[in-house]
Amino acid sequence: MPQRSAPNAGAKSGPLERQARAALRETAHTLAQLEKRAAPAVAAAAEMILGCFENGGTVFFCGNGGSAADAQHLAAEFSGRYLVDRPGLPAVALTSNSSAVTAIGNDYGYDEVFSRQLESLGSPGDVLVAISTSGRSESVRRAVRSAQELDMTVIGMTGARGGDFAALCDVALVTPSDVTPNIQEGHIAMGHAFCLLVERSLFPRGTPAAGPRRTPRKPRGVRPGTGPRTRSRA
C-alpha cells in the first residue's frame, strides 16, 4: 500500500494552511477581546456561582446543539473537578437526561424541555447558566423565565446579537462575535474562567490533579476555604 509522504515543513504554504491560519487568527482575535470586554461579567458570574455553592445550592446548565455540549462540559468541571483534587460540586446539565428530554419534548413540545425540568429540580437560590449563541433559542428563553419564577439567579451566555436575551439575565457573558463557532469558543473560555475562580475561592489549599482519583463525598453546603478531605492509610 503506497505511503503518503509527510508535508514538507519548509515548503511554501498551500491554500489549506492559509485558510487554517486565517481561521485561527479569527479565533485568537475574538478571544483577545474577552479580557477587556468580558472580565467584569465573568467575575460577577463567579461570585454568583460561589454564593450558590456556599449556601448549598445547585448550578444548572442548558443549551442546544453545540451549546448543549458546552453545558455538559462546564457542569462536569464542577461536579468532577477543574484543576485541583477536591470534593465534587452540585452542577447539573439539563441536556443530559435523554429520557426526560424526549418525554417532555414528546408530551409538551421541545420548547419546554429545560423549563419543565427546572420546575421539578430548581430551588430559590440556585443558579441557571443559560447558553444560546443567538439568544433566540425558545427552549433556553423559557428556562430563563422558569428560573426567574423560582427566584433563581440567571447567568446568560450569548453572542454579539443576543442583546434581548442578555437583558433577560442577571449577568450576561457575551462573546463579541456573530460567528457561531467563535461565539462557542468564547463561551468555553469564559466558562473555564469562572470555573477557575470558583474552585480557587472554595479550595485554596487544593492540590493540582495528577490523574484519576476518588474523592470523598462532601456535605451539601460548601464552606469557603475548606480543602479536600483525605483518608489516612492504616
Language-model region placement:
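Residue-level recognition of alpha-helical structural elements
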Residues: 16, 38-41, 67, 148
